[in-house]
Amino acid sequence: MKPPKKPVNPPFGKLTDSKAGVVKATSSQETKKVADTKPKNKGGLFSFFKKDKTEKPAKAAKPKDAFKSAIAELNPKANPKTVKADVAPAKIPHSDKGTVTPVELKPQTEAPLPPGVKQPDPKKDKPKGGLFGFFKKDKNKDVKKEPAKPATPVKTEPTSPKVEPTKVKPPGGVPTKPVVEKPVSAQPTVPLQPEPTFPVKAAPLPPGVKAEPESKKRFGLFKAFQKDDAKQPKQKLNLQDQQDRFIDDPTAKKHFSAFNQKVGNLLKDKKTRNRDWKIVGWIHGLILLFFIPLLAIMNKFVTLPAQSYPAVSLQVSINNALWGIAIFVIANIALPFITMFVLFLTGVRDVHASRPVHYFIWVLMLLNLTFLVISCCLLAAAYANLDLYNIWRNLQALDPNN
């Protein structure tokens, strides 16, 4: 008898396709070898003492096993564990405990980050706590966040849309590796440069309208003297600039007294200024009505004989003091008004609106009022003990007909 022909050994290198998830089984022994893919730990207590750190290649099948596998391919019913390679199996046994279904792998794509945002580094972002990390203070809490600066416009060109991977299935039903088309790289972005600015010329004025001269613009600091000064913002100037400005400057609040402000307000308005001068005039008129008769009486008392008028002769010193006070007060009142009248006749018409003149008049008025009070006190001290008859008798002595 002729010996049977030896079957041709099938290729043993290509047993599995790990990326596609399909097993091409050739024999039962090879399927068991493929199923046990987990490397066994051949070490001691720690992984540092492993004996074999690299996996050994699978041993080649013996000729007896090759003969059995060839028979199993010819008659699949004899060995139900074998599966034909042409048919894509739904479930492939790899162990006695369960089965594994083939899974199609899909490439994972991450969403692109917005411009200006960096991808977080997992090594740097790890919390550094240590043993007492719970009690450590977070340094980022006290850091003040600066406002984000507005992004400069960037000229970008449209990029090609992303192409999803296409899956190609062969006619046999076994999926292959997904084919991914790479998107076209975008051109480098070029930042926009600001356009140069040129001085803008003013629009021409309509016919019949004159341009404002530059001389009027110089008086922009004195807008506070206008009627609508309350609506305009007040300007802060130094002391030298305030002294150079007009009398009615209402912005100089910190450097002048309240009385100065009141005087400035009085002089600024015509009605209040006239009312103020009327008050000053009436007060000085009353002072003159007191001191003019007093001067005449004291002038007569000084010349009376001591034998006939012993009461008057006893107060000679007081009479002389009152006579001098009366002359001084009348001169203080008369000279300023006479001077103002002369200046008005010479052409200086703003004397009544001058702040120094106004201050001088008010100081003289207060001084004359104090002399008035002093004169009243001296008269009461000198002639309080005289009765009305003696006073009347002394006054009759002033009559030149007697």
UniProtKB/Swiss-Prot annotation:
Entry GO terms, CC:
plasma membrane
Locate the compositionally biased regions of type Pro residues.
1-10
Q: Which UniProt keywords apply?
A: Cell membrane, Membrane, Transmembrane, Transmembrane helix
Chief site of localization: membrane
Residues spanning the membrane = 279-299, 325-345, 360-380
Topology term for the membrane: Multi-pass membrane protein
Q: Show the ranges annotated as biased composition (Basic and acidic residues).
A: 30-39, 49-67, 135-148
> What is the species of this protein?
Mycoplasma pneumoniae (strain ATCC 29342 / M129 / Subtype 1) (Mycoplasmoides pneumoniae)
Please give the superkingdom of this protein's source: Bacteria
Biased-composition ranges, Low complexity, are 158-185
Q: Give the subcellular location.
A: Cell membrane
List the protein's name: Uncharacterized protein MG144 homolog
Q: Where is this region: Disordered?
A: 1-213
